[in-house]
């Protein structure tokens, strides 16, 4: 099983060829357009997006999940309430009736409170009693280095909440690295080599993490013409 997450920085319909080369079973794509409302399309995009789920408000920038046409995916339910608003953006789904995921693109939210990782914190807080087998994957817009900016719901708190129910970061476990000390950036602010950050993640139950076959972080020189992010690709043995 191979899963890829990538913030495409918009215009995903024009970036299908390099993404398709990853040959993943599931793609989690942030900042992508709603495939059902794309007016100018190509055959390769139509084929790639034939089996998808998408959430968002702006038809040009949302959160999409794409899989092979023969695969089965369906949305599942999580409590995404935050007062009178909704948490943004999280897409819980089930793959082939056997794997549960939560795709993520941590956003500013609507209230001005608990932005980015704070949105993820409240998702965990709302649902933690039922989150022990899910795979969380996506752009959290967060890193431990920014913990000092928050009095509640920081990055380290979220990592700890997940670890307490047996869910761990694949990158950090497989590469034997510490949070906040990542050697491989996933994001280059303003596409600047000198502003690298690790803000994209996969968290999974430890028994799945231990079955990791490969964990790859894309090279910026290969992706800088397409986005300020690089793909994070996880392959694991499903048996």
What residues fall within each predicted segment?
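Conserved beta strand-loop-helix elements of the APE1-like EEP
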Residues: 58-75, 95, 182, 188-212, ...
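Surface polyanion/phosphate-binding segment centered on an Asp-His-Pro turn
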Residues: 225-239
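N-terminal, active-site-proximal structural segment of metallo-dependent hydrolase catalytic domains
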Residues: 1-44, 49-63, 237-239
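Structured beta-strand-rich core segments of catalytic domains in phosphoester-bond hydrolases
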Residues: 33-107
């Amino acid at each position: 099983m191979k899963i890829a997450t990538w913030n495409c920085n918009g215009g995903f319909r024009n970036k299908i060829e390099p993404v398709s080369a990853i040959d993943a079973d599931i793609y989690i794509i942030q900042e992508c357009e709603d495939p059902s409302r794309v007016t100018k399309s190509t055959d390769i995009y139509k084929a790639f997006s034939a089996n998808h789920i998408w959430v968002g408000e702006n038809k040009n920038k949302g959160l999409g999940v794409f899989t092979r046409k023969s695969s089965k995916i369906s949305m599942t339910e999580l409590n995404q309430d935050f007062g009178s608003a909704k948490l943004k953006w999280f897409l819980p789904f089930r793959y082939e009736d056997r794997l549960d995921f939560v795709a993520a693109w941590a956003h500013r939210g609507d209230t001005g409170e608990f932005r980015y990782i704070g949105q993820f914190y409240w998702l965990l807080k709302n649902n933690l009693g039922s989150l022990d087998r899910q795979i969380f994957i996506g752009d959290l817009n967060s890193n431990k280095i920014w913990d000092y900016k928050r009095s509640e719901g920081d990055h380290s708190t979220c990592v700890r909440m997940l670890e307490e129910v047996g869910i761990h970061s694949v990158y950090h476990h497989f590469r034997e690295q510490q949070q906040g000390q990542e050697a491989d950036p996933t994001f280059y602010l303003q596409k600047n080599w000198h502003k690298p950050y690790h803000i994209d993640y996969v968290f999974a139950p430890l028994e799945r993490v231990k079955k990791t076959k490969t964990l790859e972080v894309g090279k910026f020189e290969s992706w800088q013409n397409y986005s300020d992010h690089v793909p994070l690709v996880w392959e694991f043995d499903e048996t």
